Amino acid sequence: MAIRCGEVQKLATIPGKGFIEGPSYCPDDGFLYFVEIEAGWISRVSMDGKYEQFYNIGAPGGLMGPNGMIYDSKEKRLLIAHRDMGVVSLDPKTKKAEVIVGDYKGKKFNGPNDLIIDSKGNIFFSDPWGTSISNPVGSVYRWDAKTGQTDAFMEHMAFPNGVLISPDEQFIYVCEFGQNRVMRAFLADGGKSHVFMHAMTYFSGGMGPDSMGMDMEGNLYVGHFGYGKVFVVEPRLGEVIEVIDVPDKEATGTDNARFGGPDNKTLFITEGFQRNIYKVPVSIPGLPIPYIPAG
């Protein structure tokens, strides 16, 4: 199916300072949740643009706060990659927060950044802070829902950021921000390991791919930080097949693109510098998180 994107519209400009990230639509209450990184807030906006702060999860030092976030439609919870706390679960109804994983072999993470969950409840999350092209020590970890064990899943990366899994759970995709590319690997052993990791898509200019969403056909919607664009990448050859521009020239910090809305056919884009949230109708619905095929 050809991708058709409608007009990009601004849903809201969020008051305050600091970056916003992690747009996550909750179908139970119709709000789009997002994080205010430096302030430590999990906030939300209604579909008519009304904003409210929802839950303060904390941000020690003003930077060690929440970053990536997804809505787990199976368990009806928000999952948050928190730079200081690790991976945290938050119930939107009760506001009960619980740390799922806070360390690896007794040592705190460098700072989790983004995450995804598979159909079995296993969580994959990136840990990029303190890494660079010259010091590629970033990792993607896998938390096992059955055993509670955490393993280093992908290593030696230059600021790994957004993480996604293909609809058939055969591939994992990671935005390697420091190298300005999207990496892809085959999942093996039922998702417990990976093989044949390679660069799928390179970008030129800008700072790097940040976070991304996926539609039902497996296309990636990559928010590129520094460009003010979302690149739609087809998964077979890694080619850019569409470019979505945000309408404000100064809004170049496009840090995430995720699906939501009543029919899951609205793409929500967060922009960090101007604290804008955009929405755009799309022809192919987004992939539910987690995606559990019928039957």
Kindly label every feature range from the protein language model:
Residues 1-18, 47-49, 55, 197-198, ...:
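A short helix->beta-strand "capping" segment at the edge of beta-propeller domains
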Residues 7-10, 50-54, 95-98, 148-151, ...:
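Predominantly a core beta-strand signature of beta-propeller blades
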Residues 14-29, 58-84, 105-123, 131, ...:
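Beta-rich, blade/repeat-based domains predominating
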Residues 31-57:
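Beta-propeller domains
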Residues 37, 82-83, 128-129, 177, ...:
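Short loop/turn segments immediately following the C-termini of beta-strands
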Residues 41-43, 86-88, 138-141, 181-183, ...:
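A short loop-to-beta-strand structural motif that recurs across blades of beta-propeller domains
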Residues 46-50, 91-95, 144-148, 186-190, ...:
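Short loop/turn segments that connect beta-strands within beta-propeller blades
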Residues 256-295:
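Blade-level signature of beta-propeller repeat domains, shared across WD40, Kelch, NHL, RCC1
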